[in-house]
């Protein structure tokens, strides 16, 4: 079952400090101690408020791109889906999140080698996953 939560129509703007200095995930490097700008995640993740929804991921078919069960996806129903996009698709009345393949033939590719690529006869795209949030520390 797909659990959909509409994005706030008029979200409260919460701008937090954005450090332009990148933080390496490899060898340590001194990071700047000051913020260069501000960032509001609503502005960053949501392109069209009226057509954007939050959808909670279930399962592990997309683990190889860092999308795990329980993660929150930001999905835009109005965005046109292109080859390679991560999409929410409907197949036989069931929803799934997969990578959209348009060539050589339309299909839905899991991002986990334990799941096969699906080539449905009737493929309905519900929306394009614009971003997702993965908590690194517990809690809903």
Regions found by a protein language model. Name each.
Residues 1-63, 83, 94-95, 102-106, ...:
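Short, positionally conserved secondary-structure boundary motifs
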Residues 70-71, 85:
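Structural motif
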Residues 112-118:
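Flexible, small-/acidic-enriched active-site or ligand-binding loops
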């Amino acid at each position: 079952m797909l659990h959909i939560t509409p994005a706030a129509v008029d979200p409260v703007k919460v701008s937090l400090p954005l450090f332009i200095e990148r933080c390496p995930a490899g060898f340590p490097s001194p990071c700047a101690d000051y913020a260069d700008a501000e960032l509001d995640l609503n502005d960053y993740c949501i392109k069209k408020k009226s057509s954007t929804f939050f959808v909670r991921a279930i399962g592990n078919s997309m683990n190889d791109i860092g999308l795990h069960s329980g993660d929150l996806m930001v999905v835009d129903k109005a965005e046109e889906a292109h080859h390679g996009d991560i999409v929410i698709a409907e197949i036989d009345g069931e929803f799934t999140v997969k990578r959209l393949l348009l060539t050589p033939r339309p299909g839905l590719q899991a991002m986990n080698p334990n799941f096969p690529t699906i080539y449905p006869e009737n493929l309905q795209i519900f929306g394009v996953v614009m971003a997702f949030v993965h908590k690194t520390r517990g809690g809903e």
